[in-house]
Regions:
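N-terminal signal-anchor transmembrane alpha helix
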Residues: 4-28
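Non-cytosolic membrane-interface motifs at loop->transmembrane helix junctions
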Residues: 32-40, 92-104
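Hydrophobic alpha-helical segments of small multi-pass membrane proteins
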Residues: 43, 67-84, 99-113
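Membrane-helix boundary connector in multi-pass membrane proteins
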Residues: 83-98, 116
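A generic hydrophobic-segment detector
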Residues: 102-135
């Protein structure tokens, strides 16, 4: 699990870097609202994925769910942002229905976040939940 989380952290770093590159592209080379939105989308979801990776390490019983949410957010933001950027630069799509697929992965990722957080509060069968013992 730890290697998977480290891989997600590395991918989040690359996603954040790509978001910054798109921000610079929007500011200096190709001022287009689609490029700006793609940059913002990548930056926001890179940070969210980093936070989810931290939660995955802190809540080991539910860590796989937090890591899955991070993976869905990163893949969704990559597909969605690439499609928007290609439309701005070349007037072409990444592939048919790429933006809806990317958006659906983003929605799924956020739903997994919600379910994972709620499940962390519930006790596991025969044990306690991952939540802190403080009341």
């Amino acid at each position: 699990m730890r290697k998977w989380i480290c891989t997600l952290v590395a991918l989040a770093g690359l996603t954040g870097a790509a978001g910054m590159i798109l921000s610079a592209t929007d500011a200096h080379l190709l001022p287009d609202i689609r490029v700006q939105r793609a940059a913002n989308l990548m930056l926001i979801h890179a940070v969210a994925a980093l936070a989810l990776c931290g939660l995955a390490l802190l809540a080991p019983r539910r860590g796989g769910w937090f890591a899955s949410a991070a993976g869905a957010l990163l893949s969704g933001s990559l597909i969605f942002a690439c499609d928007m950027t290609l439309r701005a630069v070349h007037g072409a799509r990444l592939f048919p229905m790429a933006a809806p697929l990317g958006g659906s992965l983003l929605i799924l990722g956020w739903i997994i976040v919600t379910i994972s957080a709620a499940a962390t509060l519930w006790p596991s069968p025969g044990g306690t939940g991952d939540q802190n013992t403080e009341k």
